[in-house]
Amino acid sequence: MRYLKKVTIYISLLILTIFIGGCGFINKEDSKETEIKQNFNKMLNVYPTKNLEDFYDKEGFRDEEFDKGDKGTWIIRSEMTKQPKGKIMTSRGMVLYINRNTRTAKGYFLIDEIKDDNSGRPIENEKKYPVKMNHNKIFPTKPISDDKLKKEIENFKFFVQYGDFKNLKDYKDGEISYNPNVPSYSAQYQLNNNDNNVKQLRKRYDIPTNQAPKLLLKGDGDLKGSSVGSKNLEFTFVENKEENIFFTDAVQFTPSEDDES
């Protein structure tokens, strides 16, 4: 009887230890997810900024990488990539460098096509069309004979102008990844088609699928904050060997260069 009692106590303690250890692991995962969200909030709090000229007066994260007197440059990028079944992969998007020192903004609209050659090796064909921004409007800086393309450029809106992440804290059950050696980190969430950001993307782009996307928050660099490294958003609607549909976006605050574009 005494032996059975000892065995029962031992088993109970073992179960309790496993339970506590499991809770510790869960808490550790939750803690890392919270830390990643807090890190991304430093970038996502600029969403939405409807008037791009507001970036001239927005201060970003600064560290020793910035020269004294350098007000910094915002780099914003939005790009939609599609690869229908049996067709080539095409990306269309824009990059804009908003220099707070000179209060000027320039960049380029890009069209990137990737297809396989006869040997199955990918061939990339990228075209860039230089642009500038004045009074919150985008203008090509060189003549464009294609009126449809010219209109697409002039009507382009960056995701930061209409995206909104005030409910980021409500995103739950993310797939968390963290590698302190790189360092790199990410959090991925399954969204639904009622999500406001998903609705906004569908409103502006022809997205030929009813599948709700996954949102990936992906970054590298010091998780506690650094101007070195990058942070990216990716909405993946379809991803397989035959078909791909995804939207990528990034907003970075960096030391200014003499000629960013």
Curated annotation (Swiss-Prot):
GO cellular component, one term: plasma membrane
Topological type in the membrane: Lipid-anchor
Lipidated positions per record (N-palmitoyl cysteine): C23
InterPro entries: Csa, Csa_sf
Lipidation (S-diacylglycerol cysteine): C23
Alphabetical UniProt keywords: Cell membrane, Lipoprotein, Membrane, Palmitate, Signal
Subcellular location per the Swiss-Prot or TrEMBL entry: Cell membrane
Principal subcellular localization: membrane
Keyword Magnesium found: no
Cited Pfam families: DUF576
Leader peptide range in chain numbering: 1-22
UniProt family annotation: Belongs to the staphylococcal tandem lipoprotein family.
Name by which UniProt lists this protein: Uncharacterized lipoprotein SERP2422
Organismal lineage: Bacteria, Bacillati, Bacillota, Bacilli, Bacillales
